[in-house]
Design a protein with these regions (language model features):
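A structural signal for well-ordered alpha-helical segments within the folded catalytic domains
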Residues: 103, 248, 289-292, 296, ...
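Non-catalytic, well-ordered alpha-helical segments in soluble enzyme domains
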Residues: 299, 473, 478-505
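Transmembrane and membrane-interface helices of multi-pass
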Residues: 2-179
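A long, amphipathic alpha-helix that forms part
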Residues: 50, 347-350, 388-431, 492-493
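Histidine-centered active-site microenvironments of extracellular/periplasmic hydrolases
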Residues: 241-245, 427-428, 434-477
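Metal-dependent active-site segment of extracytoplasmic phospho-/sulfohydrolases and closely related
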Residues: 225-226, 407-450, 498-501
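Active-site-proximal alpha/beta segments of enzymes that process anionic O-linked groups
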Residues: 157-226, 231-391, 499-501, 505
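Short beta-strand segments
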Residues: 307-309, 361-368, 405-408, 430-435, ...
């Protein structure tokens, strides 16, 4: 212990803490496309601020523990760099922390072992060392604090000196608010403000009114089912030309129309799904705080509305919109199972189709292809093997793709069953399917994985959009079918589903 005390003096602990706090800045200098001079400022100015904070107490461990929120964000930033390869923590990533349930989080973290172990090894010993620093009777001397203060001032002066020409040449990139951790805390503040605004949604949207009416015969039976997909990218659908026939059932249905060029507006579920269901769009997202969903429009037009979800409540706009429905059901998995498969929704669909309502809108929010992929399907959809991975790594890429493709097979089976149920009613009906976003699967040299990255890839944006119309609908409204087929190659974004649902039921 005496030898330990001699090695870990308060001064050495001080410099260890300074280095640890700088680690995210150092990594970001390598991952971000920043001007060279600004990279110097990226180290000097935050580094000086860390020094100034650490000399606030003569025991650096006290300050280090007081800065725990900074270390938490630093650990989060390092994990995201491992996952996405670049970019500062975006506000949507902070919102994902609020809206992602613990089961999903543990499924992912379990496969990110290198990153998680790395941040634990970096921060946990440091926090333990901070406790040791607090308990030691030795303190930093006033002379040491004075010298560190002078060093910090020199670093700030040098940082500003090189910042000025960098900012003059690159005014949009080389900005003080682009320095870590200032940018991360700004994004965190924006996320908290957005979360608070969402909580006020029932009040801010109370007066919204579609004034919707139906132009069709009130006695005409109509049933429309909108299936919200999860993490399904068009590139892995056989229907879209994928080398594997992952959609054999939909391929065999001549009445199924798929749209080739549809992009999601946002690559994160907590925003992309609400934007499917209301008139707001990504460029005018704040409009969502004052709007209600298409569920309210259908209710005003005389439809019985239902929202069935295989996902958990999470306090997002999806939950607010779901509660507008006449019938809202969330399916909870038993304790010994991580998540129910989507076919749990089918029995509820059967019940709704038999309640005797003339006009119905049914929305099914599936779990689709959400990671961990191999847990999203039964054995009869386990076509491609091996399909289990222990960690996210390039050597496991094929097994990961196999599992993902099997989840698409399960989606194909599910949609075919929904179509069959609608077809058997003999009523005027349609089924629309649109995924919320796609997914990265270590596709190229960037080795990107998952979705919701601050800079999305095409794999995250290109999503499948599929429509099926019943024979009765085709007979009554042939122009709609003709128009859909003629426009199946037209570029759309995910707003198309809101407009399509309103149009086919008007």
């Amino acid at each position: 212990m005496k030898h330990f005390n001699q090695i870990f003096t308060q001064r050495r602990i001080f410099w260890i803490f300074s280095g640890i706090m700088l680690v995210p800045n150092i990594f970001l200098c390598f991952t971000e496309q920043l001007p060279l001079l600004f990279k110097v400022s990226y180290i000097l100015i935050p580094g000086a601020l860390y020094l100034l904070l650490l000399i606030l107490s003569r025991k650096p461990g006290i300050t280090f523990w007081a800065l725990f929120p900074l270390h938490f964000i630093g650990a989060f930033q390092l994990v995201l760099l491992y996952l996405f390869g670049n970019s500062i923590i975006a506000s949507d990533m902070f919102l994902n922390m609020f809206t992602t349930n613990s089961g999903e989080a543990f499924e992912l973290l379990d496969k990110l072992a290198p990153a998680v172990v790395g941040v634990f090894l970096l921060y946990l010993p440091a926090l333990a060392l901070a406790v040791y620093s607090i308990r030691r009777t030795e303190t930093l001397t006033p002379l040491f604090q004075k010298r560190v203060f002078m060093l910090a001032m020199l670093m700030i002066g040098s940082g500003i000196l090189v910042y000025t020409p960098a900012h003059r040449k690159y005014p949009h990139t080389a900005r003080l608010d682009n320095l870590y951790p200032i940018n991360a805390f700004n994004n965190a503040r924006f996320a908290v403000d957005s979360w608070e605004a969402a909580k006020n949604y029932p009040r801010t949207s109370r007066k919204f009114d579609y004034r919707a009416t139906s132009t069709r015969d009130t006695e005409l039976p109509e049933i429309y089912i909108f299936v919200i997909g999860e993490t399904s990218r068009a590139g892995n659908w056989g229907l879209y030309g994928y080398e594997r026939n992952t959609t054999p059932k939909l391929d065999a249905m001549p009445d199924v129309i798929h749209f080739d060029d549809v992009l999601t507006q946002i690559n994160a579920t907590h925003k992309s799904v609400p934007l499917m269901l209301c008139p707001a769009d990504a460029l005018n997202y704040n409009e969502i705080y004052r709007q209600k969903s298409l569920i309210s429009a259908f209710k005003q037009a005389g439809f019985h509305t239902s929202f069935l979800s295989n996902q958990l409540r999470n306090g997002s706009f999806t939950e607010f919109f779901a509660d507008e429905a006449d019938c809202t059901i969330y399916f909870a998995a038993p304790k010994n199972k991580p998540h129910l498969h989507d076919d749990v929704l089918l029995s509820a669909v059967d019940s709704l189709l038999n309640i005797g309502k003339t006009k119905q809108l049914i929305i099914l929010h599936t779990y689709g292809s959400h990671f961990n992929y191999c847990e999203r399907y039964d054995t009869d959809c386990r076509i491609f093997t091996p399909d289990h991975i222990k960690e996210i790594d390039h050597k496991n890429k094929q097994a990961m793709i196999n599992a993902y493709d099997n989840s698409i097979v399960a989606t194909d089976k599910f949609l075919a069953q929904v179509i069959d149920k609608l077809d058997r009613t003999g009523k005027t009906s349609a089924m629309l399917y649109l995924s919320d976003h796609g997914e990265d699967l270590l596709d190229d040299e960037r080795n990107r994985f998952l979705h919701a990255s601050p800079i999305p890839t095409y794999y995250q944006l290109h999503i499948p959009f599929v429509i099926w119309f019943s024979d009765n609908y085709s007979t009554l409204f042939p122009d709609d079918i003709r128009q859909a087929r003629n426009r199946h190659t037209t570029p759309f974004d995910s707003r198309v589903v809101f407009l399509s649902l309103i149009h086919i039921s008007e």
